[in-house]
Design a protein with these regions (language model features):
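ABC-family P-loop ATPase nucleotide-binding domains
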Residues: 80-134
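Helix-to-loop junction immediately C-terminal to a conserved catalytic motif
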Residues: 49
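Conserved ABC transporter NBD signature motif
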Residues: 56-70
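ABC ATPase "signature
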Residues: 206-207
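The feature captures the beta-strand-to-loop junction immediately N-terminal to the Walker
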Residues: 34-36
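Catalytic Walker B motif of ABC-type/P-loop ATPase nucleotide-binding domains
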Residues: 147-151, 156
């Protein structure tokens, strides 16, 4: 399995959110997508998920351009809840089951209960930590080749953070491509074997963790790259 981007770009209102990005990931890769807010991480994930289209270049999964056919092979945990106000945690599972044939509703409800999510509770009443558990439970209940997690531990408490990391870690050896977007490097470094560093929409460093660290902590590499940028 290969996920390949070539000269990938995306513009919004004439400004590049992502510019001339090139990379290749293979099955079994657990890749950290690193950078401060506004670096292009979410835009890249939305391109991979087929939620937005490239302004230039290409992105392919096993040689197929990202689009309707590949959407069924990509699971995406976004940063926000996007459900209707009236929907319950149980309703979210029904919603996913209607859209994704690979969604295991029974596994989702089991995972949600283990996460102490109220199946009949309205999503709009969930705390930020519970919202993160909901989005992760939905994504992990799909049998997708590519699984993406956008800022999965941002703004959550320590207990929720540990639960999220454990749930993602359980997929490490599944042969899938896992892509984890974050700026909280230290907490997720142990999950990954590769890293992509984005800055102002451009890929500034990429490779295996051993290559990019060169014997240092990944957090030190992050500071070296982004130390002069606001918001780091």
């Amino acid at each position: 399995m290969k996920l390949r981007a070539e000269n990938l770009s995306r513009r919004y209102r004439g400004k590049y959110a992502l510019n001339n990005v090139n990379f290749e990931l293979s099955g079994g890769n657990v890749c950290l997508l690193l950078g401060p807010n506004g670096s292009g991480k979410t835009t890249l994930m939305k391109l991979i998920a087929g939620l937005v289209s490239p302004s230039g270049g290409s992105i392919e999964l096993d040689g197929d351009p990202i689009g309707t056919a590949t959407k069924r092979r990509v699971a995406y945990m976004p940063t926000e809840n996007y459900f209707y106000n009236y929907m319950t945690v149980r309703d979210a599972g029904k919603y996913y089951a209607d859209f994704f044939p690979d969604f295991d509703r029974a596994a989702y409800e089991n995972r949600a209960q283990r996460a102490e999510l109220p199946l009949d509770g309205r999503i709009r009443t969930l705390s930020s930590g519970m919202g993160a558990k909901l989005r992760l439970s939905l994504a992990l209940s799909r049998d997708a080749a590519v699984m993406m997690f956008d800022e999965p531990i941002n703004g959550v408490d320590m207990i929720t953070r540990d639960w999220v990391i454990d749930e993602i870690a359980a997929r490490k050896d599944s042969g899938r491509i896992l892509l984890i977007s974050t700026h909280l490097v230290e907490q997720v470094e142990g999950l990954a074997n590769r890293a992509l560093f984005l800055s102002h929409g451009e890929l500034v460093r990429a490779g295996s963790l051993d290559e990019v660290r060169s014997g240092r902590a990944l957090e030190d590499v992050y500071r070296e790259i982004y130390g002069g940028e606001a918001g780091c």
